[in-house]
Amino acid sequence: ADRFLNAGGMRGRQLQVLVEGTYYVNRLFATVEMIEKTVIDVGNVGVVVSYTGEQGTDLSGSEYRHGELVTRGQRGVWSEALLPGKYPFNTYAGKVIPVPTTNFILKWIKNEVGSHNFDENLSEVALITKDAFEPTLPLSVVVHIDYKKAPLVIQRFGDIKKLVEQTLDPMVAAYFKNVAQTRTLIQLLQER
């Protein structure tokens, strides 16, 4: 144990992951925990939020004011997402948030849910028209997130469900409510 510490090792959980191979570990000195590799499926990228590492310098630029992006190995949201594949990732040192890069559909329909379940809390938009009718408007929106912009999305919103529920839902509802106020029910149906 002293030789390990003198050679630069540290007490506690080690950040370095042992990948496949044969290792001779002194069980009186250390224990090894087996953790499955992190899998990023095709059609997704993985945005890494690291809890360890050096304090990084912001790579997001002066125009982006919602947080900082850092390079791989530094503490914070990494500026480059993990592409599809298997990764030996220390789940105690950070987390990987999956972000879909294929088109997905959000449905503003109460009992219908898309394949990713991002829209499970969405329902039809309640409108009030110029002539005082109160129709509900079911909507479907196709969303695409560029894989290079995925770290920016996670840095700003935390995850895709929060993006949908806290930003897209209020924006879409407000837009259609504003449009409906200026039109009669017949105009709204004709121009839809």
Question: Positions of the model-derived regions?
Answer:
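N-terminal hydrophobic membrane-entry segments
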Residues: 1-192
